[in-house]
Amino acid sequence: IGFLDDYLKLRAKRIAQEKGVEYKKSDSDGLAGRFKIFGQIVLGIIVGATLYFNDSVVVKREVVRADETAALPVFDREGKSIKYDSVTIDGKKRYYVSAKNVITTIPFVKSHEFNYAKLLPKSLESFTYILYIIIVIFIVTAVSNGANITDGLDGLATGVSAVIGIGLGIFAYVSGNIRLADYLNIMYIPNLGELSIFIAAFVGACIGFLWYNAYPAQVFMGDTGSLMLGGIIAALAFLIRKELLIPIFCGVFLVEVLSVTLQVSYFKYTKRKYGAGKRIFLMSPLHHHYQKKGYH
């Protein structure tokens, strides 16, 4: 999506140069906003459907056995017996089963867990996948657009994404280690430690790019890079089951989006009421407000 948008903009610039006329940047040169949103929705559907329907995307749930010699009465949706793993932690044997569910991490509550199925009546819990995919679409679209809006100053989106990646990488590593997950009382997700390798590469790529993208920037990522950064961060958050922590992780993205929303809404409201639009910030997104004040 971002690549096609950037390509169309560069193509319009090249055509203007070939005609010998001054190029004036315009939003109409790239993809229309509705096409960008459509592409992000399609991406959200793919990510959500993969996470929900792929049998390898599971979490480990601890089960208690009163009798070590008795068979463990755990069954899946089809009534088949589920295998369990036994792990010795601090000299005590613990038993875990792989569970396919839509449980995620929710901050600042005692259990640290939340099941999306609880948002629906019991009679409609079989349609949880629809609700889950809608949530994925919303978050993927919001985060990718947030990263895109943040990419307005040299090194801003790249630096913020690197910091977010470090936080997600730590969560991925501890969530994939059964002993650390048990000690920290967080959700254990098997094989998630391998994801930390990808996240390390992601952070390294951001830092490497930042070397050339820091002020004064020599290289720009455009929509190709910023939309990709947001999409990767959103997908990683869902894989780690930490998507409800995104307002904390992606606080800068959130503030940037809110600044644009407030600016546009307030301008339209005051123009309709007083005949002349007023602004909250000197310019939005927020980083341009501080740039106008000379803080850059």
What does each model-identified segment do?
Residues 17, 45, 113-115:
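A broad, structure-centric signal for solvent-exposed, well-ordered loop/edge residues
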Residues 28-31, 111-128, 186-196:
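Short aromatic-rich membrane-water interface segments that cap or initiate transmembrane helices
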Residues 110, 114, 121-122, 266, ...:
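Generic secondary-structure transition motif, activating predominantly at the C-termini of alpha-helices
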Residues 99-117:
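N-terminal TM1-TM2 helical hairpin plus the immediately adjacent luminal interfacial "cap"
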Residues 1-3, 7, 12-15, 34-104, ...:
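Alpha-helical transmembrane segments
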